[in-house]
Amino acid sequence: MTSLFHHVTVLLKETVDGLNIKKDGTYVDCTLGGAGHSEYLLSQLSPEGRLFAFDQDDIAIRHAQQRLERYRGQFTIIKSNFRYLKQQLALYGVHEVDGILFDLGVSSPQLDMPERGFSYQHEAPLDMRMDREQTLTAYDVVNTWPYEQLVKIFFQYGEEKFSKAIARKIEQTRKQKPIETTTELAEVIKEAIPAPARRTGGHPAKRVFQAIRIAVNDELRAFEEAIEQAIDLLKPGGRISVITFHSLEDRICKIAFKQASETPHLPPGLPIIPDEYKPKLKIITKKPIVPSEEELQHNHRARSAKLRIAEKL
């Protein structure tokens, strides 16, 4: 199992060191995955320090428990979507923390296990669920969602300029018979895109597969909800590190940090600024941190990663 779950952690030191670790602090890894960030973070803590880590994937959780065995008693793994951050931490009596991190990339093992249906490069049933107990799958999206809804998700979540043509082709194909596998879907997408456009910009199915994955797991709304909760949970001086992999996630992070770090326009002449209008955050990374050339040589999947860090005031 461990060999199956090999995951190269992106921006490892930059993300964890950016939290300004307090040895006896309480920290949250919202995206446990391969446990690389969690393992390095735990190595920085004293025996009094605590880590809470979230994941929805049973295989990732089992692997992480093995990998983090030497820190037993210092960490708690919570099987939950991070959109329930506050609610889940409250069950452990935790209402404020010293640092929180998000790594929003899909774990490489999830991409590489053909049966998970995340990848257009392996034949597999259309699944794409991060949480295997969830009922909605990629098969449902592809075969039952109406044309208009498919156009919307391909355009909004995949930034796919041929959204209408692809949705139309899917609609035509599924009338004959259901689209059941990743390779069938990839072929339908390829046929819908004009030949000249197929020669540029990577695999023609990439954007649509991303869009379907985001829709199946409601990823963007979950992150919007979680980042607001994360900012609230931080103690003064506590920090948040966020790694994003595409412009949609990065935009959500940028807006959340910007809104929390600005003072709204108030009437002139107020003697003091009321607490609820004071900025909550100071942005640490004016520009996002990106992987070094050296890291990219070892891990090509890190290419689109961006790290943003902010501190609670």
UniProtKB/Swiss-Prot annotation:
It comes from Anoxybacillus flavithermus (strain DSM 21510 / WK1). Specifically methylates the N4 position of cytidine in position 1402 (C1402) of 16S rRNA. GO terms for biological process: rRNA base methylation. Belongs to the methyltransferase superfamily. RsmH family. Keywords: Cytoplasm, Methyltransferase, rRNA processing, S-adenosyl-L-methionine, Transferase. It is an enzyme of class 2 (transferase). The gene is rsmH. GO terms for molecular function: rRNA (cytosine-N4-)-methyltransferase activity. Its EC number is 2.1.1.199. GO terms for cellular component: cytoplasm. It is found in: Cytoplasm. InterPro entries: RsmH, SAM-dep_MeTrfase_MraW_recog, SAM-dependent_MTases_sf. This is Ribosomal RNA small subunit methyltransferase H. S-adenosyl-L-methionine binds at residues 35-37, 55, 82, 103, 110. It catalyses: cytidine(1402) in 16S rRNA + S-adenosyl-L-methionine = N(4)-methylcytidine(1402) in 16S rRNA + S-adenosyl-L-homocysteine + H(+).
